[in-house]
Regions:
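Conserved N-terminal structural module of periplasmic/extracytoplasmic solute-binding proteins
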Residues: 1-104, 279, 292-294, 409-415
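Paired acidic/hydrophobic, glycine-rich loop segments that form the ligand-binding mouth/hinge
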Residues: 94-97, 262-266
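Short, solvent-exposed loop/beta-turn-alpha elements that line the ligand-binding surface or hinge
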Residues: 117-126, 187-192, 207-226, 275-283, ...
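Short glycine- and hydrophobic/aromatic-rich loop-to-beta-strand nucleating segment
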Residues: 150-154, 202-203, 306-308
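Glycine-centered hinge/linker elements that transmit conformational signals in sensory
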Residues: 173, 215-245
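C-terminal lobe and pocket-closing loops
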Residues: 267-282, 291-387
Length: 415
């Protein structure tokens, strides 16, 4: 009875959201074909991945050309541009690249087409966590286009074997002190990066943030407190340098590249930078999956999911383009541009591994990854996580109070 009631409430909620925001747009233009527009944040890859993808498609589809609408590099601006467009029910955006945690929000509001029936895609070749990141309430709403996972960068000249657990890693901090460098850093400034870093350590210790309904808070648990405590204690005792709570991606990367850290949590893009001739750690570092409680940790997933707009006039073309984006051909272009692919087989490709030696570690990291909280209220949930985690780090809240604050913030996120 309880399960049936929850299912009924969930269905009613989804129906209400669709009615209020998308109307019957989800049932319209299902067979429409013609030119479409693809929307994604600024393409910062050296090889111009998005341009290559679209050129290949356009060469094979002269009557269904794709135009690239390039957004800014700022994630908040990307989100707000899409939201403004969809609130107005405009049909100018046909396929949109959603940052992973936005998928649930856009699905709940009826803004993107579920990938079922004639829009279904083959997810078998894809990494399972990437598919989970595009799923809301048991239904697939987007196709994973490219992914991302956290990696542990470590000084292999000082630490021959990478640690597998937080206890093992922090137990090696004396090596950092002996070499007059910091032990560990991540992205701990009060922004989305802190949500990511906090989520990873809490998930690694068995905690979670929201229930399957995307709304019920679950963070106030012994497991969540244990995870956050590890991070807070490491900062208090100096294993994490004091300046590290000002670090975003760039600052943390610079600290590692200049030889000031023994361990760093960061994304795969850093590998090429750290191995450049200008880097102080060129040929002196390795990469591994993030540490966990008793074994490999729980990376947070990054990347983009490609979704079909509910307001598109040419949804059949849009569906074919989405399928193309996850094809072997397209994903080879993605991977060659140093963007982590969503196809599992490419992580074992010898040619790609020769170019990107971190791929085996990244595959292992993504295989154990956990999506950021899957909720239609993600911006508010993320704010609750980062605000309270930062308060615990800087000592204005205890770990228990910070976790209780997250619980309350998640509880009120939809109000």
């Amino acid at each position: 009875m309880a399960a049936a009631s929850i299912a009924l409430l969930t269905a009613s909620f989804a129906s209400a959201c669709s009615s209020d925001n998308g109307g019957n747009a989800l049932d319209q233009n299902l067979t429409g074909r013609g030119p479409i527009t693809y929307v994604e944040g600024k393409d910062v890859t050296e090889t111009g991945v998005v341009k290559q993808l679209i050129e290949r498609w356009n060469a094979a589809h002269p009557n269904e050309q794709v135009t690239f609408k390039e957004q800014s590099a700022d994630g908040t601006q990307q989100h707000d541009d899409l939201a403004e467009h969809f609130r107005a029910k405009q049909d100018g955006y046909d396929v949109v690249a959603l940052d992973v945690p936005w998928t649930a929000e856009f699905a709940a509001k009826g803004w993107v087409q579920p990938l079922e029936g004639s829009f279904a895609i083959d997810t078998a070749p894809l990494l399972a966590p990437t598919v989970a990141s595009a799923t809301y309430n048991g239904k697939l709403y987007a196709a994973p286009k490219n992914t991302n996972g956290g990696l542990l960068y470590y000084r292999k000249d000082l630490v021959p074997n990478p640690p597998r657990t937080w206890t093992e890693m922090l137990g090696q901090c004396q090596i950092a002190r002996d070499n007059n460098i910091g032990c560990y850093a991540g992205q701990l400034a009060p922004y989305e990066g802190l949500t990511v870093n906090t989520s990873e350590v809490i998930n690694a210790f068995g905690g979670s943030f929201v229930g399957a309904d995307g709304k019920t808070p679950t963070v106030n648990s012994p497991e969540s407190k244990a995870g956050l405590k590890v991070l807070v204690d490491a900062y208090k005792n100096g294993d994490i340098p004091k300046e590290a709570i000002t670090f975003k991606e760039g600052e943390s990367a610079s600290a590692f590249e200049s030889g000031k850290l023994l361990f760093l949590r960061n994304w795969p893009y850093l590998y090429a930078q750290a191995n450049a001739d200008t880097s102080s750690v060129k040929d002196k570092f390795g990469v591994a999956p993030l540490p966990g409680n008793t074994g490999i940790g729980a990376s947070t997933l990054g990347g983009y999911n490609a979704a079909i707009s509910a307001f598109s006039k040419n949804k059949a073309t849009a569906a074919d383009f989405v399928r193309y984006l996850i094809s072997e051909e397209a994903q080879q272009i993605v991977a060659s541009g140093a963007l982590p692919s969503v196809r599992a087989s490419l992580y074992d490709d010898p040619a790609l591994i020769a170019k990107m030696p971190y791929l085996p570690a990244l595959k292992e990291s993504i295989a154990s990854a956990v999506p950021r909280p899957v909720t239609p209220f993600y911006p508010a949930v993320s704010k609750a996580i980062q605000d309270n985690a930062y308060a615990a780090l800087n000592g204005t809240k205890s770990v228990d109070d910070a976790v209780a604050g997250m619980q309350k913030g998640i509880e009120t996120a939809g109000s």
